[in-house]
């Protein structure tokens, strides 16, 4: 990877609204009659930011780390995905300078809770609120009222000499360690039996 002082990443995600599931956006549960369909919790904002962070250091995308259809990530908190992207960013020798996002959805209205959502995302990223921007637009005249979309751009700055990006074998080890943590939590909190480790199948298809 070129030893540039700054790099830019772009991320995009979209999900269809679905009845009977909670609406998760920006790490928050919003009061709305429908949620977003997805294998995980469908958090369109965190997914877009995650892909932007991974893209900034050319580390792949969500599907590279969390294979589509893997039952381990069914209804998973998208903060898990974001944390892994931050680890990749740190490994490459970079940190978040700022994040700019635009949500596109007909409802619910985001502006009344944008400040709270910014605070939540900033906390997840480990940055100040002045480094996170969350805007919202409506898809007027596009017949997309049944869909939520998010565009995210991140600027990252180098804080140390970049290390060599992880090999696929190292990525597998990271995923296994993460899965072990999830298994422990499920076992301790919900009494779910631990699952055997299986060799992950990598696919760039978006699982979310």
Describe the function of each predicted region.
Residues 142-163:
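C-terminal edge-of-domain segments
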Residues 164-180, 192-205:
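Cofactor-cradling patches in redox/metallo enzymes
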Residues 134-135:
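Pyridoxal 5′-phosphate
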Residues 1, 178, 182-183, 187:
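Nucleotide/phosphate-binding catalytic cleft detector across ATP-hydrolyzing
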Residues 138, 142-145, 188-190, 196:
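N-terminal and secondary-structure boundary signal
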Residues 128-131:
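Short acidic capping loops at alpha-helix termini that bridge into adjacent secondary structure
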Residues 2-116, 120, 124-125:
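RNase III-family endoribonuclease catalytic core
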């Amino acid at each position: 990877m070129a030893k540039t002082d700054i790099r830019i990443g772009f991320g995009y995600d979209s999900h269809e609204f679905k009845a009977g599931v909670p609406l998760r956006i920006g790490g928050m549960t919003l009061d709305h009659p429908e949620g977003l369909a997805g294998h995980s919790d469908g958090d369109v904002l965190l997914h877009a930011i995650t892909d932007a962070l991974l893209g900034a250091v050319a580390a792949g995308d969500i599907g590279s780390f969390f294979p589509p259809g893997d039952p381990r990530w069914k209804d998973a908190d998208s903060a898990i995905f974001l944390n892994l992207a931050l680890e990749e960013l740190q490994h490459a020798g970079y940190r978040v300078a700022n994040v700019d996002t635009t949500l596109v959805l007909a409802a619910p209205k985001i502006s009344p809770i944008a400040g709270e959502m910014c605070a939540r995302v900033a906390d997840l990223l480990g940055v100040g609120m002045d480094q996170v921007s969350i805007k919202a637009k409506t898809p007027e005249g596009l017949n997309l009222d049944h869909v939520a979309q998010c565009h995210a751009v991140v600027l990252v700055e180098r804080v140390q000499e970049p290390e060599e990006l992880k090999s696929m074998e190292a990525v597998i080890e990271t995923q296994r360690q993460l899965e072990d943590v999830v298994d422990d939590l499920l076992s301790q909190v919900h009494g779910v039996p631990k699952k055997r480790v299986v060799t992950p199948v990598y696919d760039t298809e978006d699982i979310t």
